């Protein structure tokens, strides 16, 4: 039995990995020695050859998924159902929320520190030996992708569920040559500085994962995106593109209710795509890899979902997406979702505003429930448009008569794409001040989206705590029941303690109202929140 690595050995691997983070974006080369993104992508094939991994990597069976929204959820549905059916799976996703090992799951669980560390150093030493002199070391995400291939080939998985990191055409995951099936989730505007400024251009990049003689399945798309997908499929020999059958069109054995483990109406699109991807996968792999495939295909041919698929769809979990975490403080719940696109924020707003005072969806609630106190804890990355993200929340809260109780809190994330260790020092909150002012303006436009705290004395704002601007108020003096609109809090833990104080105040009043807090805008913020709450992994 292999000796387990120590925590120090694991940390040493993370420190070495940290050195591969360049912070570069897919921009035009700035100097004569800089490579284009296309050239960097082409080098992945050379890396695989020199590592001696080309044959083993291309021998694995892949379900490859690109898209703007719902990639991770779709992959989670696929992974859970395949495992429930008896298939040994490898799941590669990004980004991670708390621990880098979340990106590599085998049979549903993140790989061990020992597995990660041993494979990391094998890859690192091999690249140093064979590639560094003339090619250099691959950058962060490319290194992580090569590491995923190494881990999954060494652990003999039957299927690899592969989520694209960014775009598709030039993404590191696209180095594979013959996936069993490709999927495209809902498309929208995101990473426009890299992928293009129209949905059609973005769709073209996503469709870059289409391969010869490989079926492609897509969720329903807007016409402009669909045209781009169809055009690209027509250019690839033997690539047949179809739209996933709606979830409502599938029957279940005995008519049992079809319940999804992931909350939100939009998850029906992701589950429907997952079903089609698995159906195609079953028909294209060998019986040895999928001994249950013939039986499943027989059921599916009649429009009936196999029983284990129904169970798997209901059991699917995906941390940081539509996740409700009860706090240790009674009557306080955190609603976590890393939404960071306009449409995703609208889905999250509907999910959050649609919960009653018991934390149930209104459709589940049978009795009259005291309306909860709804709070907002938000951050987004500086390349995002805060107005575009916050507008759907303001509109939905107003339309559903589910106002956000003031103040909304804006705090920087401790984690970022630039490092593996959360930042523990004092951060510049100028950006959060700008985002807070955006919310204040939206609150003026959509009067019904915000509710003043019932405990607030009108006009009473603590000295040094102007609304919507950066502040460094000590935790002991920040009381949510005395602030007027938005507030910038320089530390996430301080924000958490302030919310907990608000929940205790509600309880002391005997109002019977639960406190619901929506934490959204960034997967990094959500990951930090899980860490603070002790819910990592």
Where are the model-predicted features located?
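Short functional linear segments
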Residues: 1-67, 73-87, 91-92, 132-135
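ATP-dependent carboxylate-amine ligase catalytic core
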Residues: 28-37, 49-50, 54-60, 84-177, ...
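Conserved catalytic-core segment of NTP-binding enzymes
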Residues: 166-236, 375, 387-388
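Active-site-proximal loop/hinge segments that shape catalytic or ion-binding/gating pockets
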Residues: 522
